[in-house]
Design a protein with these regions (language model features):
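NAD(P)-dependent short-chain dehydrogenase/reductase
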Residues: 163-169, 173-207
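NAD(P)H-binding glycine-rich loop region in Rossmannoid oxidoreductase-like domains
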Residues: 43, 49, 53-95, 103, ...
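Mid/C-terminal beta-alpha module of Rossmann-like enzyme folds, strongest
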Residues: 217-284, 302, 318-334
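Substrate-positioning beta->alpha
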Residues: 152, 183-185, 202-222, 229
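Catalytic helix-loop patch of NAD(P)-dependent Rossmann-fold dehydrogenases
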Residues: 95, 126-169, 174, 198
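Conserved Rossmann-fold NAD(P)-dependent oxidoreductase catalytic core, especially the SDR/UDP-sugar
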Residues: 99-145
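Short alpha-helix in the Rossmann-fold core of NAD(P)-dependent oxidoreductases
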Residues: 92-97, 113-116, 149-150, 207
């Protein structure tokens, strides 16, 4: 790889081919030399962006990708809540983070941003009406393999910060927007409900955010965030019932909406996950872990990100319209 010019900062984005990653890369490419480390080839990277094909679990590939790099955005992770081999969550999300931190420390990078998730902020015993980055949750409170792996990854970042490693942590909420085929859990949820004439739903509070605001927030956290601190990158709190109504208005599609209690949702998720694990080997429509997170969910505060970073997310309606427009017409005709 040719070294970056001395006047231009070389930046590595792991997971740069993903939903958030592609928007972050597009933003960074305006004034950085950007390199992507990902197993997937980027679908729409700006001209001049370098691509290294590989896994964050491969130390040799990671060292190659870190050549001449000054800043690292670590986004690479398995984002869904169901995969055939559950141990992959721990390997990619937790061990992959450790590999990246160890290699970046040896490289001597100036700053490292670890992209975590809001899902680990919802504890089983929390009595706070609003959740913020100050919340303290434990590994035992995590409802499944995904959240456990993400909590362990964040703990690795915090432990590294405690020993002087220049790492900042960002906790995005549920990003939506134009996805170009990157069907992340929030976008899959929108598609799931949009195509159904009868919508059975567990009502809960979620926080939706424009994916472009997440990208901008990651850059702000890298530039202005305090080492060893968390920053929640969210947008608007909205109930699923309200979201379904807004989606119906935007899409012009009528649907019968049927709320279901938490106990029924949990039983349905157990059955769906059993068949996914044992029979279909295909992601179920609901998982036990996702239902548990929904039942614990509360409004999220982004005041620290506003105050310390200058983070200013836009209203979510435009992103919601774009996300709906990105759903293939063949799916919407179901």
């Amino acid at each position: 790889m040719a070294p970056a010019p001395a006047s231009v900062m070389q930046t590595l984005v792991t997971g740069g081919s993903g939903f958030i990653g592609q928007h972050l890369v597009a933003l960074l490419a305006q004034d950085h030399r950007v390199r992507i480390l990902d197993l997937r080839t980027p679908a729409c990277a700006p001209e001049g962006v370098q691509y290294v094909k590989g896994s964050v679990l491969d130390p040799a590939t990671v060292r190659e990708a870190l050549n001449d790099v000054e800043q690292v955005y670590h986004l690479a992770a398995l984002p869904g809540m169901w995969i055939p081999r559950k141990s992959d969550f721990h390997e990619v999300n937790c061990l992959g983070t450790q590999v990246m931190i160890d290699a970046a420390r040896k490289r001597g990078v100036s700053r490292f941003l670890h992209c975590s998730t809001e899902s680990i902020l919802f504890g089983a015993s929390s009595s706070e009406p609003v959740v913020s980055e100050r919340v303290s949750t434990t590994l035992d409170e995590m409802p499944g393999a995904y959240t456990r792996s993400k909590m362990l990854a964040e703990q690795s970042a915090l432990e590294a910060a405690a020993t002087g490693f220049p790492v900042v942590i960002a906790n995005p909420t549920m990003p939506i927007g134009p996805h170009h085929g990157n069907l992340t859990p929030p976008n899959l949820m929108l598609q799931h409900f949009l195509v159904r004439r009868v919508q059975f739903y567990l009502d809960f509070t979620m926080n939706l955010v424009d994916v472009r605001d997440v990208a901008a927030g990651l850059v702000l956290a890298m530039q202005r965030g305090q080492f060893g601190h968390r920053y929640v990158l969210g947008g608007e709190d909205i109930s699923l019932r309200q979201l379904l109504e807004v989606m119906g208005t935007i899409s012009g599609r009528e649907a019968l909406r049927v709320p279901i209690p938490g106990g029924i949702a949990q039983m349905a998720a157990v059955i769906m996950e059993f068949f996914a694990d044992r029979v279909t080997h295909w992601p179920p429509e609901a998982t036990v872990e996702a239902v548990q997170i929904a039942l614990r969910s509360k409004p999220l505060s982004i005041e620290k990100s506003r105050r310390e970073l200058g983070y200013a997310p836009r209203p979510i309606e435009a992103a919601l319209r774009e996300a709906i427009a990105s759903i293939p017409p063949c799916a919407q005709r179901r």
